[in-house]
C-alpha cells in the first residue's frame, strides 16, 4: 500500500524552526547552509511530530552526531561542529550508513546453520560464451564470496585445466587458479573458504590434482570425513581454513527425479571413473543437490506451492544438520529464471548464482550477504534451526504480520557525478525510485515514487509501508530510473539490503551499478522506522 504524505503546516514545526535549531547546535548561518541540508530542513519542517520526524528527527540527528563526533577522525579535533560537518555526516554513506559493517552474528554455531555466499562458474568473465580468467575469482573473493567453483578436465598434455565441459575459449591452468585463490582467499574475511571441484579426471590426474592442492595450501586444507554424522565445526573454528568439496558421488543421498523423495540412486553414474583415495581424502564437505520437483520448488520454477510435503517441511529439518546446494537449471547453454529467496526460506545454505547473468537475482544475492559485515556467512533465523510449537517452520502457512516497516524517501544526490554520461544529455533527468521487498511470498511487494522532472537532486518526501510476516528473510531493494516516454527507462543505480539489519532513523543509502560496484557519489537519503 502506497502512503504519500502531503506537506502540511504544523504549529510546532516549520523549516525556519528546524533551521534555527541546527544553527544553534552547529555553528553557521542560514545563508551558508548547504543546499542539500536546506532541502532536508524543508521536508522535516512540514512533518508531524507523531510521524517521528520534524523537530524530533532534527534532535536525534544532532544527538547522534555529537555522540559519534570522537569516532570520526575528520571531526575529532574540531572544537565545535559547523553546518558543513552536519551536512557531510548526514549525506555520507560511510558515516551514516543504513546497515552496520561489523560481524555481529554468533559465529560459533555449526557451519550448517549459516547461509554461505556462493558463486557459480566462478572463472567466467561473462556468459557461457565469454572468456575464462582468474580475475572474476579474485573479484568474487574480495567481495566476500566463500564458495568458488572450478571445473577440472584433462588438457590433453598430461596435465589439468579449468574449463566447462563444453569449451569455447582458452582454458585456464589449475595451478594459476589455486595460486590466486590462496593469495586472495582471506583478504575480505578469515572465515572458511570452500572450493568446489567438478571434475572429469581419471585417477592418475586426480592424484596430480591432489599434489597440487596439498603443495599450494598445505596445512590450510581442513580434513574431515564427509560422511561423518558428527556436527560440522563452526566458522569460528574453521577460520583461515580451506574446505574441499566435490560434486556428489552416486552413493550420496539426493532427491529422486520422479517423486521428490530422498533416496539412493545407484543407477545413475555421476562420475565416470573411480576416485583416487588421496584425492577423495581431501574432500571434507559434501553437499546434496536437489533434483526434479524439489529443485523446481527451491528455484522458483513451480507456479505455486502445494500443501506441505517432504519438500516444504522435511527439507528444513534436513538443512539444520546437512548442506543443500541449489543452482539455476540450464536449458542448452542458458540458465533458467531463478529465485534465490525460495531456497533461503527452506534453509538451503549454498545458493549458487552466476555473477554475470540475471542481474536482478545478483542484486538479491549481494543484498543478502551485505548482512553480518559482508563476511560471507549469515546465520539463519532461529525458526529455520529449531522446531516450533507447531512443528517445523513452513513459510506459507498461516502468515501473521509481526512488524511493519515504514520507508520514507526524502531525496537523492550524486547522479550528476556518476551518471552524467548516461542520462540528462539533452535535459535534466526525470528520476523515480522503485522500492521492493523480496522474501516469503506474503511479504513480497513493489512500490514506486512519483517521477521528479528535470532534477539532478530530486526531492520526494514520500513514505511507503511494508507489512512483514518474516522480516528476518526479507530483503529491500531500491532501484532508480530516469523516466523515458518512448524508450525503456534508463538505469540510474540500485541497492539491496537485509531488512533485519536496517538501522532506524534517517540514513544515507549508497547505490551501486548493475554489477554491484559502488557508485562514488550517488545516494538516497531515507528514513527507516519500525512499528
Curated annotation (Swiss-Prot):
Keywords: Cell membrane, Hydrolase, Lipid degradation, Lipid metabolism, Membrane, Transducer. Residues 389-513 form the C2 domain. Its EC number is 3.1.4.11. Its main location: membrane. Expressed in leaves, roots, flowers and siliques. It catalyses: a 1,2-diacyl-sn-glycero-3-phospho-(1D-myo-inositol-4,5-bisphosphate) + H2O = 1D-myo-inositol 1,4,5-trisphosphate + a 1,2-diacyl-sn-glycerol + H(+). It is a peripheral membrane protein. GO terms for molecular function: phosphatidylinositol-4,5-bisphosphate phospholipase C activity. This is Phosphoinositide phospholipase C 8. It comes from Arabidopsis thaliana (Mouse-ear cress).
Amino acid at each position: 500500500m502506497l502512503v504519500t504524505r502531503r506537506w502540511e503546516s504544523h504549529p510546532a514545526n516549520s523549516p525556519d524552526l528546524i533551521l534555527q535549531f541546527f544553527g544553534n547546535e552547529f555553528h553557521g548561518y542560514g545563508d551558508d547552509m548547504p543546499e542539500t541540508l536546506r532541502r532536508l530542513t524543508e521536508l522535516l519542517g512540514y512533518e508531524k511530530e507523531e510521524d517521528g520526524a520534524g523537530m524530533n528527527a532534527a534532535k536525534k540527528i544532532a544527538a547522534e552526531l555529537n555522540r559519534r563526533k570522537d569516532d570520526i577522525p575528520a571531526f575529532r579535533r574540531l572544537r565545535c561542529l559547523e553546518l558543513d560537518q552536519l551536512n557531510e555526516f548526514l549525506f555520507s554513506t560511510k558515516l551514516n550508513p543504513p546497515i552496520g559493517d561489523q560481524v555481529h552474528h554468533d559465529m560459533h554455531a555449526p557451519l550448517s546453520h549459516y547461509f554461505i555466499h556462493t558463486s557459480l562458474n566462478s572463472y567466467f568473465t561473462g556468459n557461457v560464451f565469454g572468456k575464462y580468467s582468474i580475475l572474476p575469482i579474485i573479484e568474487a573473493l574480495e567481495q566476500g564470496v566463500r564458495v568458488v567453483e572450478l571445473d577440472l578436465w584433462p588438457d590433453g598434455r598430461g596435465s589439468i585445466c579449468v574449463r566447462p565441459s563444453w569449451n569455447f575459449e582458452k582454458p585456464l591452468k589449475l595451478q594459476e587458479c589455486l595460486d590466486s585463490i590462496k593469495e586472495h582467499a582471506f583478504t575480505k574475511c578469515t572465515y572458511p573458504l570452500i572450493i568446489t571441484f567438478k571434475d572429469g579426471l581419471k585417477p592418475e590426474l586426480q592424484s596430480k590434482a591432489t599434489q597440487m592442492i596439498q603443495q599450494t595450501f598445505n596445512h590450510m586444507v581442513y580434513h574431515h570425513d564427509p560422511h561423518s554424522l558428527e556436527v560440522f565445526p563452526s566458522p569460528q573454528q574453521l577460520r583461515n581454513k580451506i574446505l574441499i568439496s566435490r560434486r556428489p558421488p552416486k552413493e550420496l543421498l539426493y532427491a529422486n527425479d520422479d517423486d521428490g523423495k530422498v533416496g539412493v540412486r545407484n543407477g545413475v553414474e555421476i562420475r565416470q571413473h573411480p576416485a583416487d583415495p588421496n584425492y577423495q581424502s581431501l574432500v571434507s564437505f559434501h553437499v546434496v543437490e536437489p533434483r526434479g520437483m524439489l529443485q523446481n520448488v527451491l528455484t522458483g520454477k513451480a507456479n505455486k506451492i502445494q500443501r506441505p510435503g517432504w519438500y516444504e517441511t522435511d527439507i528444513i529439518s534436513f538443512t539444520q544438520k546437512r548442506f543443500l546446494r541449489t543452482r539455476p537449471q540450464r536449458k542448452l547453454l542458458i540458465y533458467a529464471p531463478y529465485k534465490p529467496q525460495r531456497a533461503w526460506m527452506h534453509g538451503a545454505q549454498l545458493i549458487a548464482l552466476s555473477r554475470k547473468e540475471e542481474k536482478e537475482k545478483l542484486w538479491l544475492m549481494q543484498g543478502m550477504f551485505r548482512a553480518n559485515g559482508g563476511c560471507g556467512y549469515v546465520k539463519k533465523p532461529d525458526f529455520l534451526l529449531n522446531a516450533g510449537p507447531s512443528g517445523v517452520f513452513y513459510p506459507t502457512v498461516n502468515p501473521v504480520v509481526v512488524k511493519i516497516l515504514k520507508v520514507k524517501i526524502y531525496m537523492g544526490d550524486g547522479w550528476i557525478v556518476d551518471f552524467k554520461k548516461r542520462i540528462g544529455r539533452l535535459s535534466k533527468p526525470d528520476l523515480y525510485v522503485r522500492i521492493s521487498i523480496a522474501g516469503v511470498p506474503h511479504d513480497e511487494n513493489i512500490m514506486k515514487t512519483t517521477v521528479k522532472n528535470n532534477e539532478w537532486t530530486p526531492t520526494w518526501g514520500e513514505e511507503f509501508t511494508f507489512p512483514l510476516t518474516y522480516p528476518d528473510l526479507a530483503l529491500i531493494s531500491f532501484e532508480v530510473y530516469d523516466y523515458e516516454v518512448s524508450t525503456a527507462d534508463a538505469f540510474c543505480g540500485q541497492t539491496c539490503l537485509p531488512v533485519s539489519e536496517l538501522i532506524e532513523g534517517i540514513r544515507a543509502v549508497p547505490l551501486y551499478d548493475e554489477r554491484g560496484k559502488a557508485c562514488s557519489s550517488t545516494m538516497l537519503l531515507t528514513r527507516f522506522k519500525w512499528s
